[in-house]
């Protein structure tokens, strides 16, 4: 401390890195949340509040694997020994919790327990964040270049510098360098003044590439045998499939077919909201898909992907027709995907007809629990080593 004309000055030094501590903690927490979301993707993909959302809101989801370190008392009140005899080996059991057998988990018990439950955190996550993590692992398989192609904008790249442009695109670094060079030529070692002639602006170019056209035909069983769980699983798969296709591909069309004993092309809203009843004749959906392809989607111009979800409970006499129509669809398609929601591993009349199909374009996946929606998406839309430009 120094005195100068009655005034006092204090010279101090502090660690300014501490001022960033809150920001660093926040960033570290966000990274932990992101890692926890990645680990929980199979459960999050089938969360009802996500599937039933409008796709735009920020939603709260439980994350049970996000552990926060904390100091607590030893509630067991056991006596602990801090030193052994010295003959212990790695892997030896040194103690057991006498109250361990008394602790009940989260299952169904015979009465009320007295042990603490498992805490979990609720994180706010946008649908966009989930999409970035999920869609990075997916791609349309067996994509081929077709005869007719459309030109679309792939990206906008700032890769040129000009003297004229928008002030929002001014390149500050190059502007200052231009001013320094001009002042240096005039014998001045200054940055200022900066004239209009020193301004440099970033400009962009549109990267354009040919993109193969594709159509995905979503077929869903809406018969009476499809219970609430089965319909929810099928709609969850098609919900994420639709968002994936519209996010990553600009020239992909999607057709929606709902069927029981009869099939009809429906709107996207009706496909995801309306339920029906009645018997099951799956061949009606395949016949309707073939009609769509023949009327609107020439296989020489389109990559075609039919996907059918059902509980496998089909009219037995219809299985032969289904097999024949599936082969006809595969002749026109890049891939045929069949998803069966079979929670209890019961006998499936439809799968019994499909199990002998050896064509590599036929892919099937059996979903037994909600987490299988994520695995089915990765199975049907797995990335190949070499993907055609799309």
Curated annotation (Swiss-Prot):
<protein>
    <recommendedName>
        <fullName>UPF0229 protein ABC1477</fullName>
    </recommendedName>
</protein>
<comment type="similarity">
    <text>Belongs to the UPF0229 family.</text>
</comment>
<dbReference type="InterPro" id="IPR006698">
    <property type="entry name" value="UPF0229"/>
</dbReference>
<feature type="region of interest" description="Disordered">
    <location>
        <begin position="1"/>
        <end position="31"/>
    </location>
</feature>
<feature type="compositionally biased region" description="Basic and acidic residues">
    <location>
        <begin position="86"/>
        <end position="100"/>
    </location>
</feature>
<feature type="compositionally biased region" description="Polar residues">
    <location>
        <begin position="7"/>
        <end position="16"/>
    </location>
</feature>
<dbReference type="InterPro" id="IPR036465">
    <property type="entry name" value="vWFA_dom_sf"/>
</dbReference>
<feature type="region of interest" description="Disordered">
    <location>
        <begin position="81"/>
        <end position="118"/>
    </location>
</feature>
<dbReference type="Pfam" id="PF04285">
    <property type="entry name" value="DUF444"/>
</dbReference>
<feature type="compositionally biased region" description="Basic and acidic residues">
    <location>
        <begin position="22"/>
        <end position="31"/>
    </location>
</feature>
<dbReference type="InterPro" id="IPR014230">
    <property type="entry name" value="Spore_YhbH"/>
</dbReference>
């Amino acid at each position: 401390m120094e005195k100068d004309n009655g005034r006092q000055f204090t010279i101090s030094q502090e660690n300014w890195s501490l001022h960033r501590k809150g920001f660093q903690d926040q960033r570290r927490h966000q990274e932990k949340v992101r890692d926890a979301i990645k680990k929980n993707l199979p459960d999050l993909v089938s969360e009802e509040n996500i599937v039933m959302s409008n796709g735009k809101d920020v939603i709260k989801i439980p994350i049970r694997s996000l552990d926060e370190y904390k100091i607590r008392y030893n509630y067991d009140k056991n006596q602990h020994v801090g030193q052994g005899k010295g003959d212990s080996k790695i892997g030896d059991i040194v103690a057991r919790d006498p109250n361990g057998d008394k602790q009940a988990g989260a299952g169904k018990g015979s009465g009320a327990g007295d042990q603490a439950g498992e805490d979990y955190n609720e994180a706010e996550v946008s649908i966009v964040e989930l999409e970035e993590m999920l869609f990075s692992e997916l791609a349309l398989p067996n994509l081929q270049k077709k005869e007719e192609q459309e030109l679309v904008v792939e990206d906008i790249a700032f890769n040129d510098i000009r003297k004229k442009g928008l002030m929002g695109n001014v390149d500050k670094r190059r502007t200052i360098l231009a001013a320094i060079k001009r002042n240096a030529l005039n014998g001045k070692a200054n940055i200022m003044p900066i004239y209009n002639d020193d301004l440099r602006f970033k400009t962009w170019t549109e990267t354009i590439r040919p993109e193969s056209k594709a159509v995905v035909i979503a077929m869903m069983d809406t018969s009476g045998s499809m219970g609430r769980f089965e319909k929810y699983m099928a709609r969850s798969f098609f919900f994420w499939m639709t968002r994936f296709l519209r996010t990553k591909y600009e020239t992909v069309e999607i057709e929606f077919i709902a069927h029981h004993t009869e099939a009809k092309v429906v709107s996207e809203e009706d496909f995801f909201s309306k339920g029906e009843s009645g018997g099951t004749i799956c061949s009606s959906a395949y016949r309707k898909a073939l009609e769509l392809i023949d009327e609107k989607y020439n296989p020489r111009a389109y990559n075609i992907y039919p996907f059918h979800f059902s509980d496998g409970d089909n009219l037995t006499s219809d299985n032969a027709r289904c097999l024949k129509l599936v082969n006809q669809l595969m002749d026109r398609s890049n891939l045929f995907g069949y998803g069966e929601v079979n929670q209890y591993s019961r006998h499936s009349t439809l799968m019994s007809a499909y199990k002998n199909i050896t064509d590599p374009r036929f892919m099937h996946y059996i979903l037994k629990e909600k987490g299988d929606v994520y695995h089915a998406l990765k199975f049907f839309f797995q990335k190949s080593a070499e993907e055609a430009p799309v």
